[in-house]
């Protein structure tokens, strides 16, 4: 059953330095199958007709990677900040009205369009939605010296992915609380949690990995070689 095409705006976060990759080139601009990782993500999103505009948060020297792609919708660039939330803030400041905002890590090139649309549909209903997968490993809470404190119930644990899709006004309201209290959040829907609004989790795919380490890069190359997985 096809989902109704709901319009939304994209903020593609492509400004991180990728220090865990131990490479001079930021991780999202390393290539897999002769194409920068960020461009895999960008092209997948750009193919969706319901997107009204795309905002790419990146350094100036990488803009040309995206401008060569012939879009039939507005493409706007914003600059990265020191933290993820600063980069997001710089991106959403360029958005007018109160659309749904689809925030995606450019280092996640294997996102599936159908799952994006499922998440958009839930965000349209609830105001905020995020892709996630059930945690498979046992997670331990440890103190500073790495001694175990307790073990949370795995049945309730989900690993968050992107896209994370939020109504623009909710993002502004969340930023207001974060900025007033000098809070740092680790993902985008945490801003919605700050204002006690619901966030719906949509079950995603374990293939929607974020390429962060050299090991991730090897896994990504393997995924691309086996197109049947996508």
UniProtKB/Swiss-Prot annotation:
Pathway in which this enzyme or protein is active: Isoprenoid biosynthesis; isopentenyl diphosphate biosynthesis via DXP pathway; isopentenyl diphosphate from 1-deoxy-D-xylulose 5-phosphate: step 2/6
Site (described: Transition state stabilizer): 20, 27
Site (Positions MEP for the nucleophilic attack): 154, 210
GO BP annotations listed: isopentenyl diphosphate biosynthetic process, methylerythritol 4-phosphate pathway
MF (Gene Ontology): 2-C-methyl-D-erythritol 4-phosphate cytidylyltransferase activity
EC number: 2.7.7.60
InterPro entries per the UniProt record, alphabetical: IspD, IspD/TarI, IspD/TarI_cytidylyltransf_bact, ISPD_synthase_CS, Nucleotide-diphossugar_trans
Keyword terms: Isoprene biosynthesis, Nucleotidyltransferase, Transferase
Reaction(s) catalysed (UniProt annotation): 2-C-methyl-D-erythritol 4-phosphate + CTP + H(+) = 4-CDP-2-C-methyl-D-erythritol + diphosphate
Family (UniProt): Belongs to the IspD/TarI cytidylyltransferase family. IspD subfamily.
NCBIfam families linked: ispD
Function, in words: Catalyzes the formation of 4-diphosphocytidyl-2-C-methyl-D-erythritol from CTP and 2-C-methyl-D-erythritol 4-phosphate (MEP).
Protein name: 2-C-methyl-D-erythritol 4-phosphate cytidylyltransferase
Protein source organism: Protochlamydia amoebophila (strain UWE25)
């Amino acid at each position: 059953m096809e989902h109704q095409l709901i319009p939304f705006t994209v903020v593609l976060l492509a400004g991180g330095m990728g220090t865990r990759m131990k490479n001079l080139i930021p991780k999202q601009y390393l290539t897999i199958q002769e194409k920068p990782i960020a461009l895999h993500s960008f092209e997948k999103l750009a193919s969706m007709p319901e997107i009204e505009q795309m905002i790419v948060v990146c350094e100036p020297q990488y803009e040309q990677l995206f401008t060569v792609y012939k879009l039939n919708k507005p493409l706007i660039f914003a600059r990265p900040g020191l933290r993820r939330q600063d980069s997001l803030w710089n991106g959403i400041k360029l958005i007018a009205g109160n659309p749904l905002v689809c925030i995606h890590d450019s280092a996640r090139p294997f996102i599936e369009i159908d799952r994006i649309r499922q998440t958009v549909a839930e965000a349209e209903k609830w105001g905020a939605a995020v892709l996630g997968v059930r945690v498979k490993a046992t997670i331990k809470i440890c103190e500073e010296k790495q001694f175990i404190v307790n073990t949370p119930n795995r049945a309730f644990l989900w690993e968050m992915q992107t896209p994370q899709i939020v109504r623009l006004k909710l993002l502004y309201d969340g930023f207001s609380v974060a900025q007033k209290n000098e809070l740092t959040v680790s993902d985008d829907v945490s801003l919605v949690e700050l204002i006690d609004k619901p966030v719906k989790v949509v079950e995603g795919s374990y293939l929607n990995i974020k390429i962060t380490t050299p090991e991730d890069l090897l896994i990504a190359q393997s995924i691309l070689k086996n197109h049947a997985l996508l």
